Amino acid sequence: MKTPFETSNGAAWTTQPQAVRFLRDLDAASERVRVQTVGRTLQNRPIQLVAVGAPAPATQAAAAAGSVVLFTCSVHGDENSGREACLQMARDLAFTTDAALSRFLERTTVLFVNPNPNGWVADTRGNAEGVDVNRDYMALATPEARAIVKIIRDWRPDVLNDLHEFGPGEFYDTDLLHLWPRNRNVDPVMHDLAREMSEEYSSAQVTSLGYSSGVYGQLVKDGEPFRQVAGDGQARILRNYAGLVNVAGMLSETANEALDDAEEADASLLNRRRVEVNYASAAGSVQMVIENRDLLARETAAAAARHTELGRTGDGVIYFAGQDDMIPTAANQVEPEPMCGYQLTAATFTQVRATLALHGVTSRADAGGRYVTLAQPTRGLIPLLFDSRSQYKIADGTPVAC
């Protein structure tokens, strides 16, 4: 059962209608696969979620209590290779007879979401309204971001790999670029697990096939990084958002232009390489879970508990800037004496109520309107949603001292 891309040997990308038919046929052909619609775009196209497990996919509740891997497949509509890699991997897992992979699927649910069908059809980075969905994971203004965040909230993945493409240039021309969450509010253990997956599993899998790999956002000369041009700690980007909600998340990017004369002469060769690299990165994430399933389940739960306790006691530090390897440089970018919560007016709460529900942020009514405590698993995210020091806050909240 080949994808249209495979049938063309890389000469033509799978179209969105073709993918809908392919997934329908895959669902019918394998008991391991379940395809569901988890949202609709403003042009009424389905946002489809593919679940794969053995002997059949677990229910949402059972999966959330166990082990889940989530792949977001080309949130930027003009970055085709992530979608193709996801279609192929879903098919391969559905029909695998490999004993180790079959055991893996008995214990872990693998999810694939095609989040931007409008951009897919239009061949645009953004959605139909021109919004970059990968800058919308805080405000959740788009149906595409809302669908992804709802999947994260309800299925509770242990790991996430966000598949993209990049335009190569001088000092920035490896087959794969990868990155972990860099936001400084991410739990340190979750940060380290995500970095381990990024470097020691996904990148390692790619390089084991003879491809090159580097860190996203870093220009490199003579083997040494000398300038950062992207890849910061913005919470509104998925790899950072994932870390803030206690998921070991990472970014995968493959070069979308020719890297040698052979690819320059043969677009189908270029396209196949793009897909192979993203597929290999995704396979690395699968291997991370195969080898560390129990550890990941334990540490995601422990991270949620650590955040809740820090929010209760007011210990730790809250950051509004910086990244994992760079501390803030200004007083208004950091809070060394954290608040215990935020006071919202009734009107503000009405404005953000649905958004908070999608983020899994809880609150309680009080005399001032609504109180959002930091004593919950989303402690690292909440100040970024409401504090005046947060560049991308979604509403105004008043910090409440402990």
Where are these regions (language model features)?
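M14 metallocarboxypeptidase catalytic domain recognition
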Residues: 1-402
